[in-house]
């Protein structure tokens, strides 16, 4: 399939020094094309903002507008990958390949839940983590 023209616009651009990132809303115009992959978006954003490591770029919450041809979502560009690992939620790190998903069995989840039910208050988090001996 031939590459069709894709236009990327950013709006509400903001530099967040506290979280060491740039954050913005991305509008992608892709007429005659179903959608644009997040990998392609990361690549184009890295060129636009001269980012050395594309792993520090996160794109999420994309919605295609009715009728197609335009999508909107959010983008974050962290100063370093370490900052991204520090501030991003775990599920987003897993999606971007910076972390691995831990597969828990159904039985483990149920046992942890039942141990936590026996304890009240702040100690509940500790009860779910370890078994009593």
Curated annotation (Swiss-Prot):
The protein's UniProt keywords, in alphabetical order, are: Ribonucleoprotein, Ribosomal protein
Positions of the region Disordered? Answer: 104-133
Highest rank taxon of the organism: Eukaryota
Q: Which Pfam families match?
A: Ribosomal_S24e
**Which molecular function terms from Gene Ontology are attached?**
mRNA binding; structural constituent of ribosome
Q: Where does the record place Basic residues bias? A: 109-125
One GO biological process this protein is involved in is: translation
- Write down the InterPro entries for this protein, in alphabetical order: eRP_eS24_sf (IPR053709), Ribosomal_eS24 (IPR001976), Ribosomal_eS24_CS (IPR018098), Ribosomal_uL23/eL15/eS24_sf (IPR012678)
A cellular component annotation (GO) from this entry: cytosolic small ribosomal subunit
Residues that span the membrane, as ranges:
none
The UniProt family comment states: Belongs to the eukaryotic ribosomal protein eS24 family.
* PANTHER family documented for this protein: 40S RIBOSOMAL PROTEIN S24
What is this protein identified as? Small ribosomal subunit protein eS24y
The organism is Arabidopsis thaliana (Mouse-ear cress)
**Which gene name does the record give?**
RPS24B
């Amino acid at each position: 399939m031939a590459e069709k023209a894709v236009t990327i616009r950013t709006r509400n651009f903001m530099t967040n020094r506290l979280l060491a990132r740039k954050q913005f809303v991305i509008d992608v115009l892709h007429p005659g094309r179903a959608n644009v992959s997040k990998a392609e978006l990361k690549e184009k954003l890295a060129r636009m903002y001269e980012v050395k490591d594309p792993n520090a770029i996160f794109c999420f919450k994309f919605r295609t507008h009715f009728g197609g041809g335009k999508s909107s979502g959010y983008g974050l560009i962290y100063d370093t990958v370490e900052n991204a690992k520090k501030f991003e939620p775990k599920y987003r790190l897993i999606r971007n390949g910076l972390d691995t998903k831990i597969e828990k069995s159904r039985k483990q989840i149920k046992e942890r839940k039942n141990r936590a039910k026996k304890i009240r208050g702040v100690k509940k988090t500790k009860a779910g983590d370890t078994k009593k001996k």
